Amino acid sequence: HPVYLWIRDDVIELRDARGLWGKDVSETTMSIHEELGDGNIQVATVGQAAENGVLFAGIIVNQARAAARTGMGTLMASKNLKAIAIRGTQPIRVADVTRFTELIEELDDRIYGHDEYAIRYRLGTTKLVSALNKIGGMATRHFQTGQFEHADKVSGEAIESQYKSKTKGCFACTIPCSRYLVIKDARFPELQMEGPEYEPLAGFTSRIGNGDLALGLKCVDLSNRYGMDAIAVSECISWAMECYELGILTREEADGLDLSWGNGETILALVDKIAFREGFGDLLANGAKGAAEQIGRGSEELVMHSKGLEVFQADPRAVKAYALCNAVSSRGADHLRAEPWFEFSGDGAEGHRDGAAVQAQF
């Protein structure tokens, strides 16, 4: 039966998780906190997508941090492991407390005085919406173009002005580049969430032709709750929309859904259908490459992937080093394996020294 792993200091045990199976990431996290009586427990868990065998289900930490790529959540759920809960209570021993404290203060001063700190504090990675759109690198309508006409409506600045409640940092991190949002929209009552980061934000807006910010944020929240790789989900949906646009897929094959770009009702329905492998979502839950191999009809040529891993939200025609990254990275299209800041900066010396100052310009 399902279990979760509970680690408290050096005591490790497997606990019954049958009552957690079928719950989403947020529900699971809060249930574990309640069961163990400690809200400071760090929880890494899977959602319903992993339980249902969605091939790109991830592991979500503390409800919002996603180890999402390559389906590790799916693998975890296949072992009947619902979550890993960790709590450390013992002090960390330091050989030289005085020097250690001095180094912390020195690093804190450098961080807080850095030009990048202020923009990270305000916008986090969502600052990239405006930056990438400006240079033609924002994945739009399944990479048909690199600029989105509604970028200003779905930017980090738009989130800050409309929905931001307060900033926050990840566990033990000095830089509070994340944020709590309260989305006041009659369609999504009581929608409160952390984030988003650039990848899911762009994935559920420009990539699928959606200029409705609140809708995009709702999709990000659902993707996290179900425990899915937002890059993969947005690729599956945008691939299907382009196939529909080109006449490769019909409305009947998509459960009667209108796959026109930016159709909010369709987008929300597909996120649910994929997570629960229902109808057309069962096909997409195999990933865009797998879905295309099953559909055929030339749809294989439309899939944006490398080695089966869906391409992230940056158009390599604008940032060409990303094309090299996508080609040679061991697991495919992976923005975590290469960050070609020299191409943003135009500084050929980048990569031969600390690039923090260059990154701060963007």
Task: Give the role of each language-model region.
Residues 25-29:
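Active-site-proximal gating segment of KS-fold condensing enzymes and close homologs
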Residues 1-19, 23:
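Long, structured ligand/cofactor-binding scaffold of large enzymes
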Residues 33-36, 40-70, 76-362:
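Extended C-terminal regions of large enzymes
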